[in-house]
Amino acid sequence: RAEGADLLILALVLLLADLAWGTLWDLAAGTDWFGSLATGWPPRQPGSLPRLPYTQRRAPAGRLLRRLNRLLGWWRESFWPQAGRALLSLLAAALLAAVLSLLLPAALRPLNAVLVALLGLGAAARRRGMDLPAGEALAAVGLGWLAGHLAFAPPEGTSALLALCLALSAWGGLRLARARRGALLLLNSGQMAAAALLAALQQPLPAGLLALLLLGQVALQPSLAS
């Protein structure tokens, strides 16, 4: 029974880290939210909400109705065609993350706050026409590792260090995919640091496996330069 419960928790963690958090990052950092909010105002055709009985145009209720109609027209003409579906997907992913966080141990919930901060940085970078591979690596790999650890064990500083090492390596992989400088240095140093940390923690099997993967990876890297 304990093994079945652990497998269920592991499956929920994978859903949280990969499906919910991954979707949130893709939508937050991959959608031009600020551009969608800044265009199309005022709308060419306001909305047509019905006027309340006995409402004068210059009365506060009349002014509020005109503003609501303009907002409705802007939503229909500009925002919804550009980012409406992305917004619905974002809300669905946020709801999924909230439900999974309630089902999983409470120790994982602070990670959602860290994710929200990373999402804000990703959206801000997108506004400037840039991407944020470091934030993507932290969200996908660093937080994912911590979620898996906290689901089964209390918080530990060594686990956080290992998460940073793996995120550093993932950052290098993302920079390598974008053909940016320093990618191999980040990729290799992150894995070397992770293997050294595992060896220091007297975990020879995972440390050895990671070292073997690193050796094979380094052996293939000269072909990338050519």
Describe the predicted segments one by one.
Residues 1, 134-152, 186-199, 226:
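Small-residue-rich segments of transmembrane alpha-helices in multi-pass membrane proteins
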Residues 22-30, 118-131, 172-180, 218-225:
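C-terminal ends of transmembrane helices
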